[in-house]
């Protein structure tokens, strides 16, 4: 643990340690984060708390979920700082917040330290809670995280507070008794004074103090103590103890930690989904080639490209896409659009920002962030400004912008996916029905995505440039750390909405590609059979040269998008029949066959009549086979590295292939995925997509 002692000559300014924290891949860091999140016990020592642990305690209801344990080795140093305060006062020492007033009125003096702490809590209990649905209470998850982080800070022994108070707050955590804190009212410098004063208010038994019981009831301080098993009655605070609890950044940094846990997972998920986007769009995977990204030097982009490259290298879709893209190359764009082709370059900087913000927040939750700092070894009370939560405000502003940019890319990809002019042969709006005139698929969902994205871009605006001078111009610059963290929480929630919607759309596209291949196979089989029946023989009984047109007929089918004709395959207004007829006419005009012209064109007429009779039945049979799971052509997703994600959505969450006929709405399915993401259920399927990745790009051959 960092603390008193000689200056580290090798890294006196801590830049080396900060750089070392960024070693290794972002994915490995996320895996460690998830592992820490799943630990059943969090033992806090003062300087080793991790973002994943904060998120775990926040989400757990009590010790049955995650237990919190104090490091007993911290007891002597905590006791030493508490005793130093009392000894200093006894010898006439003058310490801010102990013998003086607060903030802009610190010129005032008092010898009644305990009474000063009571007044500190009284005047800081300035929050408004409201009632019912209009309430302004901080979510219990955030309060639990704040309690954990505050204990961690105070455990370092620089704050002048008794160990017994930290034990009491820990008991509240472990028994699921959560103080009620106001949602608003802090500028996170001097720390989160107003919300933290309500934690202090509960342990001192203030009459307005309330808590949420394990069964969700609001209870007063007395019942809260009883439920938590805290004996000995309420605490009467010694000098400095109230200030130690309230004068710190723990609410802002705690919420920031929980937000960054989710943000890191969503960042990796966005990389995986960009690869799936390439799969369903029949994209060109060369955009992930390592040389391209190596030459640009940015580690975030290099890793994003390598992750996408890994998924695409193990994808059955890509071998099929290669054949599709090699057909008539001069009639197709040479490159994919930016939303796909530059996705590593777009996501990379966002991941770098998110990673840096995470490390900044992790440093903050392990910092001593109150004032004054008690240096027992030198016998000093150091009056400084560690309560200034600027690392939180700036990190949250930066992270929120990165989150908004991830959402912007997701919206761009989604917009291509649902647009038949850009989606390389998928249906308009990803409609899955037989009749596209009665199925508008994801049209409403695209409108919702536009709404989500617009709000997310608005939230990307910074908070920290809206600082107001406060408290008699003593707090004339302040961080707005908790405010920024709250807005980042909103941004993460909206990105979850977008991600959920996008995943449902991608799974729909996967199944449309499966349907497309089966319909195309049925069409080719049907055309082959009809061609053999109609085109093989002349009326004279001789072999007809028209039989040699079969290969060209199949090529014409390959060139035509299945969903451009699947709802009415024999319509003269749709391209399939037009192209097949053109093949036969071209053959008749160029074959030099001695067969009479009338016979040639009668064959074309007969060919089309036979198709009109057989083809709709074959296409319907293909649809039924796909729906029943008996399709002859397997779904390529099964042989792709992205399959774990698809399987989870389809099998575990029970999301279905959407059609207008089923009446199941897109929102119902998106909600299932949203809940899955919010409950952390998507983490393992996401990581399973990357379980074979060795952390390196493919070799440049």
Curated annotation (Swiss-Prot):
This is Phenylalanine ammonia-lyase. The active site is at 96 (proton donor/acceptor). The modification 2,3-didehydroalanine (Ser) is found at residue 190. It comes from the Eukaryota. Pathway: Phenylpropanoid metabolism; trans-cinnamate biosynthesis; trans-cinnamate from L-phenylalanine: step 1/1. The gene is PAL. It comes from Oryza sativa subsp. japonica. GO terms for biological process: cinnamic acid biosynthetic process; L-phenylalanine catabolic process. It is an enzyme of class 4 (lyase).
